[in-house]
């Protein structure tokens, strides 16, 4: 499998971080920036609390679906989803292992954490 050029890691959900909503604002800014592009050749990896952005309760489900429709691969950590009891709540993206997400981050030409 070809390694992605850009991998964006999203480990937080912006709710319980005690940073006055800064994580939520950072994620919202990322979503809006990605939506400025017609094609999005990136992989977004969600793990730990960040998997909550991909559930039916997320305020960004429709935006994330649009980002996926524009070419982004959206990956949720299966173990994180299971630990949070969220496996049946996945609204957008696909499940993969933590090891595979690590491989994507390590193998990417560019990686960032939001």
Task: Name each model feature, range by range.
Residues 1-2, 37-38, 67, 103-106:
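Solvent-exposed alpha-helices and their adjacent loops that cap or buttress functional pockets
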Residues 4, 9-48:
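Conserved mixed alpha/beta catalytic, RNA-binding, or beta-rich assembly cores of soluble enzyme
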Residues 23-29, 58-62, 94-95:
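Charged helix-capping and loop-helix junction motifs
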Residues 31, 61-65, 102:
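Short amphipathic alpha-helical segments and helix-helix/interface helices
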Residues 41, 71, 108-109:
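Short, well-ordered alpha-helix to beta-strand connector turns
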Residues 43-45, 50-60:
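N-terminal beta-loop-helix "entrance" segment that forms/cooperates
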Residues 59-86:
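A glycine-rich helix N-cap at a beta->alpha junction
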Residues 84-114:
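C-terminal structural segments of small proteins and small subunits
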């Amino acid at each position: 499998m070809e390694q992605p050029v850009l991998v964006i890691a999203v480990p937080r959900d912006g709710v319980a971080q005690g940073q006055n909503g800064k994580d939520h604002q950072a994620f919202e800014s990322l979503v809006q920036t990605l939506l400025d592009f017609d094609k999005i050749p990136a992989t977004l990896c969600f793990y730990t609390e960040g998997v909550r952005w991909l559930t039916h309760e997320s305020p960004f489900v429709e935006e994330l679906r649009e980002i996926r429709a524009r070419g982004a691969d959206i990956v949720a950590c299966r173990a994180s989803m299971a630990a949070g009891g969220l496996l049946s709540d996945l609204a957008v993206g696909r499940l993969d292992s933590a090891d595979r997400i690590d491989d994507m981050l390590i193998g990417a030409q560019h990686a960032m954490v939001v």
